[in-house]
């Protein structure tokens, strides 16, 4: 079993993050925490890759579809489809957006990497995400505007929610051997039990 400081997580800068030239800003925020990158991949995803990534079944589609129906009723808008159909439309919209242009897939490693990256990224909706997070600081989209325009919310980046999800997603986006194991000088400062030999004491 790997040491906690070797935990790995997955993050993906979406097409809107790439098009707004925010790759450097986002990467620097991750690096400043002390996490290290062990893989990058710049690509235009396939539909198959995206459906595997989202891994949503009909139960999920019904659940989000029901929320869509509730929202339409609250606004006095007509309900023209079933919850399942609305949910499938949402999933299709997510896939269509993710395949619309280049993305940057990343693997980061370090102590509590999953939780650290999730904290930096912020909540799914930029409008309500905590101040200081990537989504709150770098974009102003909201569910309300996205729903009105019949599109997915543009929130710049995806990250894994938990370690098992990170393991699953990394296998979708990276092949065996593409995750690089190496020593980074920062690890000595972050994790070494005794800094005396570094500080000359």
PLM regions: where:
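Non-catalytic terminal and connector segments of soluble metabolic enzymes
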Residues: 1-201
């Amino acid at each position: 079993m790997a040491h906690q400081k070797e935990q790995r997580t997955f993050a993906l800068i979406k097409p809107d993050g790439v098009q707004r030239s925010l790759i450097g800003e986002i990467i620097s925020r991750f690096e400043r925490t002390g996490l290290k990158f062990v893989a990058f991949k710049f690509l235009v995803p396939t539909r198959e890759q995206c459906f595997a990534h989202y891994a949503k079944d009909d139960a999920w589609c019904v659940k989000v579809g029901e929320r869509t129906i509730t929202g339409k009723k609250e606004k006095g808008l007509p309900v023209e489809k079933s919850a399942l159909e609305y949910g499938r439309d949402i999933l299709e919209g997510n896939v269509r957006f993710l395949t619309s242009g280049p993305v940057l897939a990343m693997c980061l490693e370090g102590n509590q990497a999953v939780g650290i990256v999730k904290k930096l990224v912020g909540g799914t909706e930029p409008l309500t995400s905590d101040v200081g997070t990537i989504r709150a600081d770098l974009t102003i989209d909201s569910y309300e505007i996205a729903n009105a325009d019949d599109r997915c919310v543009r929130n710049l980046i995806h990250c894994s929610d938990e370690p098992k999800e990170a393991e699953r997603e990394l296998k979708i986006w990276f092949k065996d051997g593409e995750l690089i194991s190496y020593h980074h000088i920062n690890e000595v400062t972050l994790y070494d039990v005794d800094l005396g030999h570094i500080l000359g004491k």
